[in-house]
């Protein structure tokens, strides 16, 4: 399979931009990868998940056929009856954050909870606490809004 992949990178003209690693995925160091492709049974995906979650935020993970259970994919596609899943490694954002709003008003406090790329929390500003709405975490990019925001 690795030889097949190498040939395809040459045919596509990207061989100088791709490194194909052939080996035991639980032994090889692929921590610098920007894309990891998997075709592993579900239990192996789950064994590998802690290692994947330590990778640089923004790293893309693609799996043929098998998902990661409670870690919902960022995207699902199908080819016939075969699903494909992709995830983007999220930054760890859970915790307490304090910042000064752009208008220079009193400091605001943001309390975030996180499960993979799913984020929720509360924003306390001017003595009022409210939930963050529509939070989206994609790699190291977090966006949300709150009542009173434009």
Sequence positions of predicted segments:
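Structural recognition of the beta-strand scaffold that forms the well-ordered cores
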Residues: 19, 37-38, 62-63
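S-adenosyl-L-methionine
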Residues: 2-32
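C-terminal substrate-binding/active-site "lid" region of AdoMet-derived donor-dependent transferases
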Residues: 45-94
